[in-house]
Amino acid sequence: MPAVHDPHPPVLEIVCHAPPDRLNEDAWLALGAGPLGEQIIAAAIDGATTRLTPPALQAHLDRQNEPLTPAAFAARFIRDSLARQIGTGRPPALRTLLLEANADLGRALIALFGALTLDALKLPPDVHERLAHDPRLVRLGLPAAVLTLIEYDPRTHTLRYAHAGDTLLLVAYADGRFSVPTAGGASSDSALLRTAALLRDDFPDLPFRELTRHSEVRRHVLHSALYHNYVDEHGLPQRTQGIGVLDGLPELRYFVQTGTVDLEGAIFACAMTDGLLWPASAGEVFSEDGERITALRKERLGSMAGQIAEHGLRGYLKRLRAAEAADPDHERYPRMKTHDDATGVLLRFA
């Protein structure tokens, strides 16, 4: 038996913040697990904006006790599925937890639609006609979420994780190091921002915020959902071209990342949604130099880790919101939204 590392459990810090007058489409989870409840399982969950809302899904949302978007529905459904599994007292491995939550969502969607196919969504005839050439476009109408799921084991002072999408795990150490063991997959945001930047010659007087709302950018947004659990025209998963999401489709199993992190010397470990990330500067977003992009990202994440270590999640969030508000036109920090939902579940060890 491995020796118990530390009798004192880590301190939990949690933020889950949405901009005023907007529904929070994130969710979070933090529960005890194991025979004595000595382990901690936590998750940061980000509902993905659904490109199209099928009538049966909208009718289901309208019957709920509170207004829900498809993204909020997906995030909360996944949270509740995870909680039920963890509540058994001896939950399975994190990868199994994640995949079973996705399967739960798939079963619920099949109960609504009859099948996870484009025809079953019963979209308006003109919309269906535009999409019918590619059955993979069913992804545009499926509610989806991404998440980072973590499990702290005090006996070994290690952290296991299972991950799908553009949420992330950030670990900071007392010696100044930090790591982000989760990879985001093929994100569409960079391509969307570059598309917006190309419009600057045609619309030089528009702030970048307005360029991101142009019809050309919105068209790319609509079809970017094709890359959720992406498969090629032959139905073969293409992990380097797609991004893992929990949308009920079984192809998710090819996109789940798992691993273990040694926490020796760690100050904190934090699962977070991308809205809690310090935004990338224009120099990082639009650079063509891979080494420069890597260096700027490392500097940005290092600064972020330092702010969280010093000020805590709430203090960091206050500074993040101030920086976003000071850039209302999205020129310093090119991004799709001024403020995104921001969620983090942090385990502080020192």
Where are these regions (language model features)?
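N-terminal entry segment of metal-dependent catalytic domains or homologous docking segments
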Residues: M1-A83, R136-A144, T167, V245-D262, ...
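Short Pro/Gly-enriched beta-strand edge/turn motifs at strand-loop
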Residues: P7-I14, V127-D134, A326-P328
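Short, solvent-exposed loop/turn segments that connect beta-strands within catalytic domains
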Residues: G34-E38, P154-H157, R177
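Residue-level marker for buried hydrophobic side chains located in beta-strands
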Residues: I41-A43, H163, A269-A271
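Short helix/loop capping segments that flank catalytic or ligand/cofactor-binding pockets
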Residues: L52-P54, L159-R160, L170-Y173, V180, ...
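C-terminal catalytic subdomain
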Residues: L57, E216-A350
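Helix-loop-helix
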Residues: R63-T117, E291-D327
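Catalytic core of PPM/PP2C metal-dependent serine/threonine phosphatase domains
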Residues: R90-A174, D205-V261, R332-H339, T343-L347
